């Protein structure tokens, strides 16, 4: 489109109203608002298995179009990193499957990046906990802890031979989960990686020795 300059307007004897009529472009269309709704989440998984998130994308409060991209992002090093992409099906429904390979515990979210017709939207999902299976036992009886302090029946924590003192460990057993620090050294039995304190054992419903899931 050629824009009429004031000089040209004088030359052509055009009125100001005529100039405005020729240079005003149509306003761009307003983008549709969007929202993500999560209907199911499976975020506690063993390494080598898939985390799964299902939901629906809405556009202006109505089921979204098929074929729109929805991504899963994890929080790492103060940034959100996209780890897997999916696309909506009929009714704006989406399903994201993420193969979890490395033990970790991180915040995750789903995001619709937006396009030329619809605005972007984001929904926090929770924490993705990727576990590995480890042998564990429990101990009690009081005494001094290698990381400082005294062991009591209410002390929450674990003993480990190599993790630094204070390292937080997410442990899952029988559908229960706790996050506790490394407070002691041990266990000193071949094949075992963690000794749970009595309070940690009770919180998990763990008895004797056996396999627990750990994010470390």
Task: Name each model feature, range by range.
Residues 2-30, 38, 44-46, 54, ...:
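Secreted/periplasmic proteins
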Residues 78-86, 178-179:
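Surface-exposed loop/edge segments in extracytoplasmic proteins
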Residues 19-23, 70, 83:
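Detector for intrinsically disordered, low-structure N-terminal pre-sequences
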Residues 34:
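Nuclease and nuclease-like effector domains acting on nucleic acids or nucleotide cofactors
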Residues 47-61:
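Beta-strand-rich structural segments
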Residues 57-82:
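Short flexible loop/turn segments that cap and initiate beta-strands
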Residues 69-73, 84, 170-172, 181:
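Beta-strand signatures of extracellular beta-sandwich domains
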Residues 115-119:
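Short, solvent-exposed loop/turn segments at the edges of extracellular beta-sandwich modules
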């Amino acid at each position: 489109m050629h824009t009429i300059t004031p000089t040209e307007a004088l030359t052509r004897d055009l009125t100001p109203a005529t100039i405005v009529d020729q240079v005003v472009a149509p306003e761009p269309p307003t983008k549709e608002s969007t929202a993500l709704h999560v209907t199911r989440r499976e975020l506690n998984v063993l390494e080598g298995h898939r985390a799964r998130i299902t939901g629906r994308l809405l556009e202006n409060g109505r089921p979204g179009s098929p074929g729109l991209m929805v991504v899963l992002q994890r929080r790492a090093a103060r940034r959100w990193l996209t780890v897997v992409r999916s696309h909506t099906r009929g009714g704006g429904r989406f399903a994201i499957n993420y193969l979890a390979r490395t033990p970790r515990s991180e915040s995750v979210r789903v995001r619709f990046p937006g396009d030329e017709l619809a605005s972007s939207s984001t929904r926090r999902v929770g924490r993705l906990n990727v576990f590995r299976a480890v042998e564990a036992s429990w101990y009690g009886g009081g005494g001094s802890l290698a990381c400082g302090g005294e062991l009591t029946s209410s002390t929450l924590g674990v003993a480990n031979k190599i993790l630094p003192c204070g390292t937080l460990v997410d442990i899952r057993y029988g559908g229960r989960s706790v996050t506790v620090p490394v407070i002691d050294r041990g266990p000193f039995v071949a094949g075992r990686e963690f000794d749970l304190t009595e309070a940690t054992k009770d919180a998990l419903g763990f008895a004797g020795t056996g396999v627990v899931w750990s994010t470390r």
